């Protein structure tokens, strides 16, 4: 599958120039950075995805340093690696994929300290990855994040397009899609240890499953942000849903003796069948 990687450092420099000249950061960001690629990025999407646009960055000093480093990024090598990933997990069509690299806000301490300076967003085929080259080792995580987001593309193509209507929009779907995506990326890059999967002890995850997640997996009315990304006020740790989903998938893989690619077409609730005791998660 053809994968095209676009580095936006030139557009970012245009944005910086306009902001320094006194123009509105929000307007310039939209005109110089986002709108240049947004229509193409969303060309496969079945509905409007405007809420997923990358947010404006106003720290111009940091952005200038990021641009200098982004310009040095080898996008050709990245594209080859991304194509290797797509060959391991073929999609259900041959549509080419575009990956746009935007900078991430240097002021986002969560991304910098817990996500290695790299986050991705899937847009029903194409995707974008936000990177902070000021974070040490960020380059290694671009490929992991691509693998994770690309798995979303394939999973979504199967369940939301080819088999539309066969899922019941239960919370188990959310746990499984990210659990499988991280399982896929971890198999490709086993030396990388994402904090969002391993920041909690196994006892903590077991407790979360027993007291919280096992009670809501079949619900269609779940606060997604709280239970996937965490909520300190409700005692849900950061990214707890990712950690729980990953263990759920890993448990099923061990019991079924299948691999992570083979279970992509397995309905999410089936992954629960083996969880007859909390010990197994």
Where are these regions (language model features)?
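Post-HExxH zinc-binding segment in Zn-dependent metallohydrolases
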Residues: 2-4, 8-11, 166-208, 279-281
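Auxiliary, metal-adjacent structural segments of Zn-dependent hydrolase domains
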Residues: 62-124
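Hydrophobic, aromatic-lined core segments that form the binding pocket/scaffold
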Residues: 121-123, 130, 154
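Short pre-active-site segment immediately N-terminal to the catalytic Zn-binding motif
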Residues: 131-146
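Inter-helical turn/loop segments and adjacent helix faces that build the functional surface
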Residues: 136-137, 160-169, 190-199, 255-262
């Amino acid at each position: 599958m053809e994968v095209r990687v676009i580095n936006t450092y030139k557009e970012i420099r245009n944005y910086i120039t306009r902001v320094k000249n006194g123009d509105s950061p929000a307007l310039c960001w939209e005109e110089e950075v986002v709108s240049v690629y947004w229509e193409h990025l969303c060309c496969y999407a079945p509905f409007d995805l405007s809420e997923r646009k990358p947010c404006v960055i106003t720290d111009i000093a940091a952005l200038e340093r990021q641009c200098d480093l982004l310009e040095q990024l080898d996008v050709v090598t990245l594209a080859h690696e991304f194509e290797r990933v797509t060959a391991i997990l073929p999609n259900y069509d041959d549509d080419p994929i575009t990956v746009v690299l935007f900078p991430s806000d240097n002021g986002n301490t969560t991304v910098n300290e817990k996500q290695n300076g790299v986050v991705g967003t899937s847009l029903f085929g194409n995707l974008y990855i936000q990177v902070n080259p000021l974070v040490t080792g960020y380059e290694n995580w671009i490929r992991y994040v691509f693998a994770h987001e690309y798995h979303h593309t394939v999973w979504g193509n199967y369940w939301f397009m080819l088999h539309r209507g066969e899922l019941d929009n239960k919370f188990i779907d959310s746990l499984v899609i990210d659990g499988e995506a991280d399982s896929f990326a971890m198999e490709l890059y086993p030396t990388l240890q994402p904090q969002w999967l391993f920041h909690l002890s196994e006892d903590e995850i077991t407790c979360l499953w027993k007291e919280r997640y096992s009670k809501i997996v079949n619900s269609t009315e779940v606060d997604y942000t709280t239970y996937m990304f965490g909520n300190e006020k409700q005692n849900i740790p950061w990214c707890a849903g990712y950690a729980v989903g990953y263990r759920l998938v890993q448990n099923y893989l061990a019991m079924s003796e299948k691999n992570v690619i083979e279970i992509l077409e397995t309905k999410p609730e089936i992954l629960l069948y083996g969880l007859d005791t909390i010990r197994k998660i």
